[in-house]
């Protein structure tokens, strides 16, 4: 199960009744707008469900809103659905960091100096916007910052108008302080670099995002597969289950299913 905890407590189950899973596939769309192109792709999926029995859940993530909080409404990201496929046409997407790995996140208090308890053996990142940091180790980037004056702190924000993932390097036993301007910023601890589910990432041509903010320093290879449009992404979903894209695409485009 893909794990992404936000202020929750895990419970160990002693026994459970196994049920047939409800979905074969979790389809995540992150788009700058959900217009005609998305509707056409979704219509193709509806036909596929009716005539070929594919069970799926669609998760819509608006690129101009907080992706992490929107993800919490998508049951199939967290339940026993075995596969996730992700599409984005947002070049600044953080979904590879948020969905492609396992993390534990805590909400940062707004406009309050906060000193988190951290494990120096773990890796951390911020998911937010306009977040400042003051390293308490005088040998690090925060040298010269006044722990009581946030105007002297290092600004982690990259100047984007929306929330995004930001790596926190150089964690030491001295720790750091954080200051979040907005109410929907998170401090996240990396639990696993690889998810337990099968996940594939697709991006619209000319809008290919960067990789995971933590892994990017270790690998330049892109995990994003490039497609021309969101409808072409749908054809890749057909490939995933039925193998013959062209034949199935012709069925979707030309057959009067309904």
Swiss-Prot record:
Role of this protein: Outer capsid protein involved in attachment and possibly entry into the host epithelial cell. It is subsequently lost, together with VP4, following virus entry into the host cell. The outer layer contains 780 copies of VP7, grouped as 260 trimers. Rotavirus attachment and entry into the host cell probably involves multiple sequential contacts between the outer capsid proteins VP4 and VP7, and the cell receptors.
Any single Gene Ontology cellular-component annotation: T=13 icosahedral viral capsid
Record localization: Virion; Host rough endoplasmic reticulum membrane
Topology versus the membrane: Single-pass membrane protein
InterPro entries for the chain: Rotavirus_VP7
Protein name per its UniProtKB record: Outer capsid glycoprotein VP7
Subunit structure: Homotrimer; in the presence of calcium. Acquisition of the capsid outer layer requires a high calcium concentration inside the endoplasmic reticulum. Following cell entry, the low calcium concentration in the cytoplasm is probably responsible for the solubilization of the outer layer.
Subcellular location, principal: virion
Domain of life: Viruses
Annotated family: Belongs to the rotavirus VP7 family.
